[in-house]
Amino acid sequence: MSLHTENSQPSIGVYPGTFDPITNGHIDIIERALALFDTVIVAIAVNGQKQPLFSGEERKEMIEKCFEKEKGRIIVKIVPSGLLVNFAVEQGARAIIRGLRAVSDFDYEFQLALMNRKLVREVESIFLMTAFRWIYISSSLIKDVSKNGGDISDLVPKHVERLLEEKYRP
């Protein structure tokens, strides 16, 4: 059931993140967001506080490979610097989608949602709880485990696992 109605424009949701790399937790949120929106824009954010392992283009290709069968419904874009809520408006999005893993995520996300609401009332924030089996993983943790030779095979897609191996064990 999407938020699209017969007489309205297709519904668009923006799911932002650094996705460095994309994990099965991210994929779960994107797949569930597709049940709510006609189109999900996966917005690769540039975060000046984070030093990414993968370039923006590498992350874009990584994500697109995960969703080859959903081409057209999932659009991957690298977001230039600026306010995410403004990007959402430019894309015609009705909502910003955020995944929550724990209560500690909610505090920060709640502040962001309120600020975005103050800036642009027409864009909603939608929170999706990460599936229980992915609740403990993060991109940072995945990179750390991979760098130190741990098994991440059930936490990321195979092509992402290979790319991490290439980065850490060329």
Curated annotation (Swiss-Prot):
Q: What Pfam family does this protein match (any one)?
A: CTP_transf_like
Q: Which reaction does it catalyse?
A: (R)-4'-phosphopantetheine + ATP + H(+) = 3'-dephospho-CoA + diphosphate
Q: Which cofactor does it need?
A: Mg(2+)
Q: In which pathway does it act?
A: Cofactor biosynthesis; coenzyme A biosynthesis; CoA from (R)-pantothenate: step 4/5
Question: What residue ranges are annotated as transmembrane?
Answer: none
Record note on quaternary structure: Homohexamer.
Designated name of the protein: Phosphopantetheine adenylyltransferase
Q: Which organism is it from?
A: Desulfotalea psychrophila (strain LSv54 / DSM 12343)
